[in-house]
């Protein structure tokens, strides 16, 4: 069963938006979208919070997400999160059958 992961990245002085920009411009976003089992990977900027970025990340199943978490890209993502001193909040959702 597919599921969606919402990740809220929060920083200071525009760092969350810079993180999303660098993720996109570095090609990491396209690599993740090309991974087996990834169904959606998109960043959004809340209208009422300039210091937060929402990532909506959808996976076919837990196995696909586990493979993503074991990929080398996770080290790159973690390094960027550290570079921009971001805090994360994660929510997981499944479809209503």
What kind of feature is each model-predicted range?
Residues 2-4, 52:
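A general secondary-structure signal for short beta-strands and their flanking turns/coil
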Residues 42-51, 76-97:
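Glycine-rich beta-strand-turn "strand-cap" elements at beta-sheet edges
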């Amino acid at each position: 069963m597919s599921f969606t992961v919402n990740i809220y990245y929060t920083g200071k002085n525009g760092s969350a938006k810079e993180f999303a920009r660098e993720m996109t411009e570095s090609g990491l976003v396209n690599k993740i979208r090309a991974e087996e089992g990834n169904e959606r990977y998109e960043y959004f900027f809340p209208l009422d919070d300039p210091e937060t970025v929402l990532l909506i990340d959808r996976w076919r199943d837990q196995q696909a997400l586990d493979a993503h978490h074991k990929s080398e890209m996770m080290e790159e993502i973690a390094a960027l999160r550290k570079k921009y001193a971001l805090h994360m909040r994660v929510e997981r959702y499944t479809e209503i059958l």
